[in-house]
């Protein structure tokens, strides 16, 4: 078979396959719910991140300090390009971790009214619970994020410690956004470019988030806003 004939045969097979897949869209996935899937987190790659260590299972080829990555797909968003997100929901989390000196690791999530939260002490930059474990106050921004190929998906952009100042500023900007009528913009009515910048103090250097509002609402961003609205409604209902 010559190359031209082989190419035509391949195209026909591909066309038939495409038709079959379209006709069977979603088949076999009926029993998979949100509880059965892992929500991706958006994180920054720092100097000691495992994503930079070639002998680590979490290593990502091509990753560099300051890049942002998706914890599920392992997609990298380069530092100066970043990722576009539309916020959908915000919530505070109070998370308990073992200290690294004790082995480290997540212990549990505390309720916002847990009395232990009001009984913490400071040891340098670490906030300690009465039992000696670390309390990490976290801002979780549920967002719709856009991948490099244009696909969009729910993600969690969580911020803690030095990132909290960025989160508070972002919340302030979202809370001050207005519609032409002067009414308050819904949380999913704005889109943002998330990149990173280098910060430093007497304890070292690290990368932190930088968020810039996108004023040009393209059809792609409109789609993200609609998805973010659906996400907000689902989360609000406990779905």
Please provide the spans of the model-predicted regions:
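Short linear motifs at secondary-structure transitions and domain/linker junctions
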Residues: 110-121, 168-170, 183-188
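Long, compositionally biased interface segments
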Residues: 172-239
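OB-fold ssDNA-binding interfaces and closely related basic DNA-contact patches used
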Residues: 1-150, 201-202, 206-208, 213-218
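Detector for methionine-enriched segments
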Residues: 1, 20, 37, 119, ...
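Short acidic, glycine/tyrosine-flanked loop/strand segments centered on an H-E-D-like triad
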Residues: 142-177
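Generic beta-strand structural signal
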Residues: 137-142, 153-155, 185-192
